[in-house]
């Protein structure tokens, strides 16, 4: 016989960004709890609103499955004393299992007999097991938590109610000083407290009080309502996924509506309007059929359509205040001088341990010039890089960016163009922030990419130099994101800039404002980001082998990892890698600076390998280079089959080791083959 279980936790208003992850976490923790406690079920589903987290288990068994476990104890010779009686070791073993020596039996394992006991545990009633549901709720973790009243505990928000129903039967439990019942709260303004009749009636009972418990249903309602407005008004609406996910977790009963604003505000840059609506007011942007921004917006009310016109007017009034600010800053910022703003950056702190923004820009300018050479930019591009690096942070002191910090770089580009800066310079000012997320947009221009690299490199090196190094999940200055951006830009543009040599060169630079330190840690940090970018689809041993190669060119590292991963599926992979691994291991015994002497070769297999090594010039794609190396496998095998490398003759031994070392030198640019696993 099965029943349905409902658990609802009523809370004060949750931050929108934690609602969905918390629902998912509750479902996962409940599933783990039921599995660990041997309670089977048919399905499990989550519910969430800004004021509740809930989980419903369908078809829950009314009793645990019985448990039968075998336990292996000491060997028979230890379990029995000289008189054939059970020893203290045997007695202690069974006592620890809650059994007696009468339960002991002996079983043979690999030719020797051992003590075994079998323990049977009858399944408990589901109601008894579910008494531990508060432990499931207590196990949830949140990015923030709070204390309330005089309680000693903390949680994401104060708890107001707890419901635990098994079909229609309430289980009496306590969590954070709240006793369970069947009362849930309806909509804050439209609904009332309501009694949940049963686990099955949960959604219907809440719906009667203007609460849509299913986040998926709220999302579908919002989309359908927006699409209906689109059709009626003949407009297009940008349904941004992130905004949609935020809005659906701000409301319990969604009603979408369209508002408007004075078309005069369309003269403000579109990015300002979109930021005001989307980021600050959580409004959806409206466009005409040609994609042009319209003086309208769509918002979602937490309630029904009653008095909707008043709600629309209120939202329009709030937005106009934002747009007035935007219009003012747009007008006033154009009166400012870029050079004056840049000069003032000397008084803006980049970080108290690192110095000013102006000092950061000075270092970035030097790095950018160096990178422009390394990346092979034209003279015109180098000139654009130099000018962009000289001014690229000026918009931080504009009124617009002060009010809308999301527009850093974007407004810099616009103001730069208005003052006559070259398009390449203006674009680089915007692009230097890219990518601004793990999968975010990359710079499109070489000038912008070089400036972005330089800015991120100085940021990384500066923070490391003053000891502000990320540890664990703690990364307050987003250095992992910056480094991931460095790796992605290098890969995207295919620039063959050896990172180890680049970092060496940067550490040789001299600045009055800062001395770069912790070089080894920086390189390890960059390696970790390259490893992450390779992805878990690439086997760990391949990632490690490639990262241990002698060539640290990011695009090539990524390509070689993919080539090796593909090759690992071929029959030729194992023998080739094993041959090369043997070469690597022996080559470690080679004496430095020993020249290969052909007159010391004693057989044709040595000569054949020497000829192959001498003529080996890796070229082409990573896949083609790997094929060149793997093609040496038969020659290497013949050499080992017919040649004693570690011969007693020291001169011949050193010569053979030198030959192997030369081979390693040529192929280790691909990977450290001795780190590859062929088992």
From Swiss-Prot:
GO biological process per UniProt: glycyl-tRNA aminoacylation
SUPFAM superfamilies: HD-domain/PDEase-like
Pfam families: tRNA_synt_2f
Any Gene Ontology CC annotation: cytosol
InterPro entries reported for this sequence: Gly-tRNA-synth_bsu, Gly-tRNA-synth_heterodimer
Catalytic activity: tRNA(Gly) + glycine + ATP = glycyl-tRNA(Gly) + AMP + diphosphate
Keywords recorded for this protein, A-Z: Aminoacyl-tRNA synthetase, ATP-binding, Cytoplasm, Ligase, Nucleotide-binding, Protein biosynthesis
KW Ribosomal protein (keyword) present: no
Main location: cytoplasm
EC number: 6.1.1.14
GO molecular function, a single term: ATP binding
Compartments where found: Cytoplasm
Keyword Transferase: no
Entry similarity comment: Belongs to the class-II aminoacyl-tRNA synthetase family.
Subunit structure: Tetramer of two alpha and two beta subunits.
The protein's name in its UniProt record: Glycine--tRNA ligase beta subunit
């Amino acid at each position: 016989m099965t029943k349905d279980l409902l658990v609802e936790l009523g809370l004060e208003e949750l931050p929108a960004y934690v609602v969905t992850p918390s629902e998912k976490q509750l479902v996962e923790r409940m599933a783990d709890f039921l599995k660990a406690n041997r309670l089977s079920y048919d399905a499990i589903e989550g519910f969430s609103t800004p004021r509740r987290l809930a989980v419903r288990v369908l078809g829950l068994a009314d009793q645990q499955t019985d448990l039968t476990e075998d336990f292996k104890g000491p060997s028979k010779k230890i379990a029995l004393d000289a008189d054939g009686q059970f020893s203290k070791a045997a007695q202690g073993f069974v006592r620890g299992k809650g059994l007696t020596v009468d339960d002991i039996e002996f079983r043979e394992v690999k030719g020797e007999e051992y003590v075994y006991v079998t323990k049977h545990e009858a399944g408990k009633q589901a109601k008894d097991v579910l008494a531990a549901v508060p432990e499931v709720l207590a196990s949830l973790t949140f990015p923030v938590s709070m204390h309330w009243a005089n309680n000693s505990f903390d949680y994401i928000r104060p708890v107001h109610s707890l419901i635990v129903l098994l079909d229609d039967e309430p289980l009496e439990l306590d969590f954070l000083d709240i006793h369970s019942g069947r009362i849930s709260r309806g909509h804050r303004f439209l609904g009332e407290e309501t009694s949940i009749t049963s686990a099955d009636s949960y959604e219907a009972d809440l719906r009667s009080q203007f609460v849509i418990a299913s986040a998926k249903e709220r999302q579908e309602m919002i989309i359908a309502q927006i699409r209906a407005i689109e059709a009626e008004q003949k407009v297009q609406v940008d349904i941004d996924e992130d905004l949609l996910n935020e809005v659906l977790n701000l409301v319990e009963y969604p009603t979408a509506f369209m508002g408007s604003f004075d078309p005069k505000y369309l003269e403000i840059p579109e990015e300002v309007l979109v930021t005001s609506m989307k980021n600050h007011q959580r409004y959806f942007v409206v466009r005409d059929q040609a994609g042009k921004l319209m003086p309208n917006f769509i918002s979602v009310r937490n309630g029904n359509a009653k008095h909707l016109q008043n709600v629309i007017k209120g939202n329009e009034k709030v937005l106009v205040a934002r747009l007035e600010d935007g219009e003012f800053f747009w007008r006033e910022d154009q009166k400012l001088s870029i050079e004056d703003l840049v000069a003032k950056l000397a008084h803006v702190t980049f970080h108290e341990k690192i110095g000013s923004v102006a000092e950061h820009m000075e270092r970035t300018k030097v790095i950018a010039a160096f990178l422009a050479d390394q990346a092979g930019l034209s003279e015109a591009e180098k000139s654009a890089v130099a000018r962009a690096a000289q001014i690229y942070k000026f918009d931080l002191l504009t009124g617009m960016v002060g009010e809308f910090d999301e527009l850093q770089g974007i407004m810099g580009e616009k103001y730069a163009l208005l003052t006559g800066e070259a398009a390449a310079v203006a674009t680089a000012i915007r692009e230097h922030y890219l990518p601004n997320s793990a999968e975010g947009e990359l710079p499109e221009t070489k000038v912008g990419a070089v400036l972005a690299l330089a800015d991120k490199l100085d940021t990384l090196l500066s923070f490391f130099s003053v000891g502000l190094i990320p540890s664990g999940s703690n990364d307050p200055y987003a250095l992992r994101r910056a480094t991931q951006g460095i790796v992605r830009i290098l890969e995207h543009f295919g620039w063959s800039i050896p990172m180890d040599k680049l970092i060496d060169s940067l550490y040789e630079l001299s600045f009055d404002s800062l001395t770069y330190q912790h070089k080894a840690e920086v390189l390890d940090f960059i390696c970790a980001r390259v490893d992450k970018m390779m992805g878990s689809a690439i086997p760990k041993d391949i990632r490690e082998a490639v990262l241990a190669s002698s060539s640290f060119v990011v695009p090539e590292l990524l390509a070689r990892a993919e080539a090796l991963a593909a090759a690992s599926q071929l029959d030729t992979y194992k023998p080739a890698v094993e041959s090369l691994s043997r070469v690597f291991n022996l080559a470690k015994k080679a004496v430095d600076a020993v020249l290969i002497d052909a007159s010391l070769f004693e057989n044709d297999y040595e000569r054949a390998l020497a000829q192959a090594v001498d003529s080996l010039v890796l070229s082409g794609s990573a896949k083609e280079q790997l094929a060149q190396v793997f093609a040496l496998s038969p020659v290497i095998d013949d050499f080992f089959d017919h040649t004693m490398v570690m011969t007693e003759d020291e001169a011949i031994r050193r010569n053979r080791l030198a030959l192997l070392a030369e081979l390693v030198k040529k192929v280790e640019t691909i990977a450290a083959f001795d780190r590859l696993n062929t088992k």
